[in-house]
Amino acid sequence: MTPILFVDRDGTLIVEPADYQIDAYEKLRLVDHVIPAMLKLRDAGYQFVIVSNQDGLGSESYPRASFDGPNNLMLQIFASQGIEFREVLIDCSWPADNAPTRKPGIGLMVPYLQDRTIDWARSAMVGDRITDIQFAQNLNIRGFQLRTDEFGGEWDWSGIAHELADAPRRALVQRNTKETRIRVELDLDRVAEPKTATGLPFFDHMLEQIGKHGGFALEIRAEGDLHIDEHHTIEDTGLALGQALREALGDKRGIGRYGFDPESSPWRVAGDTPQHGFTLPMDETIASAALDFSGRPYFVFEGEFKRERVGDMPTELVPHFFRSICDASGLNLHLTVRGENDHHKVEACFKALARALRQAIRREGTALPTTKGTL
């Protein structure tokens, strides 16, 4: 899915003159900070589409030839800096015409509304007038009004680029069924003490390990049919957590993607490769988790538990919980544990997963970590 940044032209990309017509080369001047901001957004995966009202373009008062020269030069300047526009959409009507193709109308947007490859949740509109914001509202996307002396507004280009490209990776998932009501809220870019309440104290303690050792803010609230047994509550919590991870990561641009032993791990065999996953000891127990946010859910578990349950958590539901996370998040997880104490073994599994997640979700740049073009 590709996000689109729709941009106005006059007053947004280039400074608008007093007569509102850029019909001569000497009138052409770029808006401050527009190029570095758009380069940042390009690197974050955005494509750009110009949507502009040009009153009476092609009439005697505004000949097409007077428009084309400065406009082509503007496009060449942007292209020379690595900024290409997917399309330039111009409405040439007068305001009195009330044409559906004139902003804030969205008549020019029909092909885009039919394009299922567009990430509308991340798409946005930037302009200097209230009609640009109304255009964004009609498209049901976010609108940014650039700050100008004439039309007001609150944003500059640097702030817009930061808001869109560096947006916090958050998710709020509410999963309601006849058996459970699960609420998961997380913020992958904020550290906070985890908060969990599922009605199963030992399970709460394990969920806290994911947020604490994963290095992100995590809140989980669950109400389930515990009068029947624990299965639905634990399973649906895993599904909701997996969905929240998937939503917060978005297109996964810039993340580490993989979680495994770092080169500096004291638990790796000398000269070994990180194929055994993130290895974590807990007294006599050792667990390892290797994971990949590939978009292809797959779960492999190697380990045994001697006890039927630890606290109020059935041990048979430990691997089932991790499988549920994988199914909902598109995660490939290999989890291995060995030891004597089942409490230690369960807790080590959760901590190993958390530390592997910490690596995989870490931002390392802006590139998409795949050669396929999508994850």
Swiss-Prot record:
GO cellular component, one term: cytoplasm
Subcellular location: Cytoplasm
Cofactor dependence: Mg(2+)
Catalysis: reaction(s): D-erythro-1-(imidazol-4-yl)glycerol 3-phosphate = 3-(imidazol-4-yl)-2-oxopropyl phosphate + H2O; L-histidinol phosphate + H2O = L-histidinol + phosphate
CDD domains documented for this protein: IGPD
Source organism superkingdom: Bacteria
Family: In the N-terminal section; belongs to the histidinol-phosphatase family.
EC identifiers of the protein: 3.1.3.15, 4.2.1.19
Pfam families referenced in this protein's UniProt entry, alphabetically: Hydrolase_like (PF13242), IGPD (PF00475)
Keywords: Amino-acid biosynthesis, Cytoplasm, Histidine biosynthesis, Hydrolase, Lyase, Magnesium, Metal-binding, Multifunctional enzyme
Source species: Xanthomonas axonopodis pv. citri (strain 306)
Binding site for Mg(2+): 8, 10, 128
PANTHER family: IMIDAZOLEGLYCEROL-PHOSPHATE DEHYDRATASE (PTHR23133:SF2), IMIDAZOLEGLYCEROL-PHOSPHATE DEHYDRATASE HIS7 (PTHR23133)
Involved pathway(s): Amino-acid biosynthesis; L-histidine biosynthesis; L-histidine from 5-phospho-alpha-D-ribose 1-diphosphate: step 6/9; Amino-acid biosynthesis; L-histidine biosynthesis; L-histidine from 5-phospho-alpha-D-ribose 1-diphosphate: step 8/9
A biological process from GO: L-histidine biosynthetic process
GO molecular function: histidinol-phosphatase activity; imidazoleglycerol-phosphate dehydratase activity; metal ion binding
HAMAP family linked to this entry: Bifunc_HisB, HisB
Residues forming the catalytic site: 8, 10
Residues covered by region (Imidazoleglycerol-phosphate dehydratase): 169-375
Name this protein carries in UniProt: Histidine biosynthesis bifunctional protein HisB
Residue numbers spanned by region Histidinol-phosphatase: 1-168
